[in-house]
Amino acid sequence: AGLLRSDPPDRYVFNYRASYAEETAATVNYLVKVKRLKPSQIAVFAQQDAYGDAGFSGVARAIRALGGDENSILRLHYQRNTVDVDDAVDQLRKSRVPIRAVVMVPGYRAAAKFIEKTRDLFPGMIYTSVSFVGSTALANELMLLGKKYASGVIVTQVVPALDGHSSLVLDYKAALAKYFPGEQPDYVSLEGYVAANVLITALRRNGPDLDTEKLVTTLENLRDLDIGLGTPVSFGRSEHQGVHKVWGTQIDENGRYQPIDLQ
């Protein structure tokens, strides 16, 4: 959340992962540079709160950097803790500019309802969402509606693909199977595993003589830490975010997430 990402950073707050703004910025770059869409063809469907604002700011920043007009972005709203997406659907239908992709910053039920109500109206639409949506919950909800609603939906992630072979993902799966044999791997628990891994590394480096200030100093001196992500984790006195990388995944016709290259 933006509240926990002050600049300069709060001394006692460290974030492992990329921000929602970084996720949506990566999505816009993918849509423009890989899918060859014009910035004007991208809309945003976002919750009306700080979470939605954070995602929208990433889209606006990326579109500005690509030479587009951030002030003309079609922003589709819905109220937090609801699935009332009718106004957003109407706005999309009335848009004078043909929209080819919607970057979503939602909860999973609202995302599914929005896709359900617009998929047939815009069969070629590209739908993307940030990781907060809950990848498993979104895929399950869409598959209940039918394969055509789920297939092709893109979700950005802040950890590597679950079906990949990075050493950290393999370690995570082994630990999950050992300690929680009834649980299935998912992106939410993998993110927690990664964050805990970083903290444990800092605790070990700090040693037994531990207090808050010493732990903060140890974290701020973590540089190029390799925990098997495929990208290093680094902090500093003015940098309390360890990783800025965003990974791409896409739901296939069986409701499973497949990795995609965002660049």
Question: Where do the protein language model's features map onto the residues?
Answer:
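Sec-exported extracytoplasmic/periplasmic mature domains
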Residues: N29-L37, A60-G68, R93-V97, E116-P123, ...
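Second-shell loop/turn segments in exported
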Residues: D10-A18, A46-D49, R75-Y78, I99-R100, ...
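Catalytic-loop motifs flanking and including active-site residues across diverse enzymes
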Residues: E23, G55, A110, L168, ...
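Segments of small-molecule ligand-sensing domains
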Residues: L176-L190, I200-R256
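Structural motif
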Residues: E23-V28, H77-R93, A111
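Extracytoplasmic ligand/sensor domains, especially the bilobed periplasmic-binding protein
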Residues: A1-R75, I126-S151
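Extracellular/periplasmic periplasmic-binding protein-like sensory domains
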Residues: D7-D10, A18, I115-G192, W247, ...
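Periplasmic-binding protein-like
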Residues: Q41-A46, V97-Y108, F114, M125-S131, ...
